[in-house]
């Protein structure tokens, strides 16, 4: 099959095509979009001012500095350290890796894993998890969720997985794990020598103190988990492309 003969299979692209076709056929209809997690307000003034200052600095001979540190600027890493420390979670600066967004990290981190690994993915969830692994040829197993289990899948000892995806709060259901529930997943991962890829993009919306905002609030998680987060939601940053990944030193 030629590449030009292939049809788009990314969920959001398919939905966009259907929405465009519907709008063309029904221009009088107003569509409420509950798909991609975009924001509805402009960038905060402090963000815009900081960007202006950075561009101005780079436009001077004295201020131009070219490429930044490959793992991210220390001032941003230190701010992330402080953000986690405010919730009682300690991170080392060299455990934090700044990137161009969580979506990129979710794909790039898979370069650390073999293509014959088995991947456990909750259903429903952010479709990128499946797309990235199918592209690499990995086997996908689904952890089914429903209203009966609060849309929160729990470990099944009869299932063996090497890579475990957890999104909490979940996209799209909004369901979030307690620390006790996440401890069950940590124990399962350690038992199976698996790695949890924890998507914390929506952690800032958690207000219930019984719910974990980081998997590193759970004992043992530093030995089996990688946490990926985005500024898109906490800072209204969609389209600006900035996020980070936390890889603990204990993870082998």
Model-inferred region functions:
Residues 168, 196-197:
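Residue-level marker for buried hydrophobic side chains located in beta-strands
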């Amino acid at each position: 099959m030629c590449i030009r003969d292939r049809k788009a299979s990314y969920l959001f692209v398919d939905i966009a095509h259907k929405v465009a076709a519907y709008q063309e056929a029904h221009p009088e209809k107003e569509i409420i979009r509950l798909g991609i997690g975009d924001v509805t307000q402009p960038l905060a003034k402090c963000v815009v001012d900081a960007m202006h200052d950075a561009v101005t600095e780079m436009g001077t001979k004295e201020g131009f500095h070219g490429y930044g540190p490959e793992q991210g600027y220390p001032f941003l890493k230190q701010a992330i350290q402080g953000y986690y420390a405010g919730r009682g979670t300690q991170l080392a600066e060299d455990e934090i890796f700044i990137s161009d967004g969580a979506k990129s990290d979710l794909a790039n981190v898979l370069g650390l894993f073999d293509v014959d690994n088995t991947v456990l993915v909750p259903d429903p969830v952010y479709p990128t998890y499946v797309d990235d692994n199918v592209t690499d040829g990995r086997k996908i197993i689904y952890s089914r969720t429903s209203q009966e289990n609060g849309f929160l899948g729990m470990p099944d000892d009869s299932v063996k997985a090497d890579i475990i995806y957890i999104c909490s709060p979940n996209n799209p259901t909004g369901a979030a794990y307690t620390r006790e529930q996440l401890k069950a997943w940590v124990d399962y991962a350690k038992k199976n020598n698996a790695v949890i890829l924890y998507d914390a993009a929506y952690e800032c919306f958690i207000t219930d103190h019984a719910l974990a905002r980081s998997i590193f609030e759970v004992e043992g998680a530093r030995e089996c988990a990688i946490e990926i987060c985005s500024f898109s939601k906490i800072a209204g940053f969609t389209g600006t492309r900035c996020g980070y990944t936390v890889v603990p030193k204990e993870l082998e």
